[in-house]
Amino acid sequence: MDNDVFSKLKVADIKALFETEQALELLPLAQEDDRSSVQKLAASYIKRQEKELKEQQRLMSMYDYEGMFYDQGIYHVAGVDEVGRGPIAGPVTVAAVILPPMTLIPGLNDSKKLTEEKREILYDIIMKEAVAVSCISYGPEKIDELNIYEATRQAMYEAIRTLSVPAEAVVADAMKLPDLTIPVESIIKGDSKSANIAAASIIAKVTRDRYMKSLDDEYPGYGFGIHKGYYTELHKEAVEQQGVTPLHRKSFEPFKSIVRGVKPKCLLINLFYDSTIKLTSIFVLIVLVVSL
């Protein structure tokens, strides 16, 4: 297309052409066009291309750790991550995901950095693209039995072990997995640095969130679908009004003290007790002094 033909096109037509494969060919013509609106279309296209290039580079960099294994001929690298260590109710959920090498999934990132809508979209893409996916949840009883850290680690072992395609290596988000007999790379903030870990974080997050939402029918008034088990004001009020449920982790405060029957009498202690903050000796000393 020459300048004469291009100059006779309507702005709306040019805008539509910039959404086709002809965009790159039309860019020089648009930049030289006298119409400011057409020049803005060209500038917008360049900005969009730069953004897409930056995103592609980010996604490729998320295979830096996996790349060390790919270079050794190890291609089934499982990313493993957890969701739910912090809440005081509900399970800890772990996912293990093996993506095909260098599979670029636009928007893939740490699940905490994504909206719920975006996580749901990526969940479907990951489930479709992945070589293998496994997801394991350990409930409150298991967490109370083992402690949250060990329960998380054991869930990771199980998630890796139950993959339909055996993992040849593992990249984990800041977790040591010494019992594995295959190579393991533990990565701090791995859910934003590794594609497979990011994918695992999304699978785990969506799976756990869906489960917590499903509990609203069984435990109305607790708001599990809203706070997902974290100790928010809504959650606190629900527990005060309706009591502790089987979903609550009895080894976590404040339920640990409640289950033991420990209920501070002093107002000062009650304030900190309600905030789930453990008292130190200085507060005990204050109470003793006041009582004298």
Q: Whereabouts are the PLM-identified features?
A:
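RNase H-like, Mg2+-dependent phosphodiesterase core
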Residues: 1-78, 85-268
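Short hydrophobic targeting helices and cationic amphipathic motifs
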Residues: 267, 271-275
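Short, intrinsically disordered C-terminal tails of secreted or membrane-associated proteins
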Residues: 290-291
